[in-house]
Regions:
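Hydrophobic Val/Ile/Leu positions in short beta-strands of Rossmann-like dinucleotide-binding domains
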Residues: 313-315
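Domain-scale recognition of functional cores that engage charged ligands
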Residues: 3, 285-293, 321-325
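Glycine/serine-rich phosphate-binding loop and adjoining beta1-alpha1 elements at the start
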Residues: 136-138, 160, 165, 173-311, ...
């Protein structure tokens, strides 16, 4: 399980460097073809975070050096060598894991964000969580300690589509979280985002619950869970989620109930847009209303009165998305036939 989870994680590091060399299948094949080495990495991970007696830094560094030498000497190919060394580097950057938590629903790690940094991801997030479970992978990224952002579920219909989505999963979460960080420049909360990528046919309810439970494993201060986790970060962390694509009111209510059951200190704040509390941003189209204000000003600035003259609009997204779907409705409400979506 550790080897498989790390394989899915390092895919997000290696694939941007060489998409054809480092497909997910090739990464997993390299791990299986060098099983003694990949198992040694997994065993090191297991010992490092064993709550009964975690490996100290000096011993860990010595074991990493020894294993690096072994990989350099015996890996079956240069591609395999890169895969195994990156897997070992991933272990170095793990700050917390739920691997030893009894009754867990997925394999989760809290990462040092430097592990996923590259030239296309120059801004360093405050925190990154990765969860691998049966039928899904998921990330949560935030750019400040206190940050809010939506949780979305990506549901590909085919293996080919899933492969494309897997390649861009972290970049999508990173990009959306960073955009939210910029949008939130004038308020105390920073930007965050979470996304769960489902394999075709995987059940959305089970995967959402497994992802959320795995996050709670790593952040709840509940003593029984905390005693099963070795924390190298020294941080008490709070996460604030909001509903995004494919998250239903039933999911929202379950998430809040589960957070309370797991001893999370602020369960009602763990997920926003709860039925019966506050306003439903989706129903009122809050974000889309703001976009429409900017659109109206921009059109008038270039000499187009949108209430009297026709204009065309290109929307990146779709009617199934919260912002785009509400935007189409608002365009029709305010501008009628003058607004032509292309």
């Amino acid at each position: 399980e550790i080897t498989l989870g790390l394989s899915h994680l390092i895919h997000k590091v290696l694939n941007p460097r060489a998409p054809f060399e480092f497909t997910l299948e090739r990464i997993k094949n390299c791990a299986w073809a060098n099983l003694p080495l990949s198992m040694a990495v997994a065993l090191l991970f297991k010992k490092r975070f064993d709550p009964r007696g975690p490996m100290d830094d000096a011993t860990f560094d010595a074991e990493c050096a020894k294993l690096t030498s072994e990989i350099d000497r015996t890996a079956s190919s240069e591609t395999s060598r890169t895969v195994l060394l990156t897997m070992l580097d991933a272990v170095r950057h793990v700050l917390r894991t739920n691997y030893h938590v009894h009754g867990r629903f997925g394999f989760a790690v809290r990462l040092d964000p430097k592990f996923l940094r590259n030239d296309d991801r120059p801004a360093l997030p405050y925190g990154v969580f990765f969860v691998h479970g049966r039928g899904f992978d998921g990330f949560h990224v935030r750019f400040q300690d206190i940050a809010r952002g939506g949780l979305r579920v990506v549901m590909p219909r085919s293996e080919a589509q899933h492969g494309r989505e897997a390649e861009r999963l972290y970049d999508e979460v990173y990009g959306l979280a960073f955009a939210q960080q910029l949008k939130n420049k004038d308020i105390p909360e920073g930007g965050a985002k979470a996304a769960i990528l489902l394999e075709p046919g995987a059940g959305i309810d089970r995967c959402v619950k497994a992802f959320v439970n795995s996050l709670l494993d790593l952040i709840t201060p509940e003593p029984e869970t905390r005693n099963q986790i070795v924390d190298l970060s020294g941080l008490d962390e709070l996460i604030y989620l909001g509903p995004d694509e494919n998250i239903t009111p039933d999911h929202i209510e379950w998430v809040v109930r589960r957070a309370a059951l797991r001893g999370y200190p602020l369960p009602t704040a763990f997920m926003s847009s709860k039925p019966g509390a506050g306003i439903n941003h989706k129903v009122y189209g809050v974000t889309s209303e703001g976009v429409n204000v900017f659109l109206d000003v921009a059109l008038n600035a270039v000499g187009i009165d949108p209430r009297k003259q026709p204009f065309t609009v290109k929307i990146t997204g779709g009617p199934d998305g919260d912002v785009a779907g509400n935007m189409i409705r608002i365009l029709d409400r305010d501008y009628g036939g003058n607004a032509k979506v292309v």
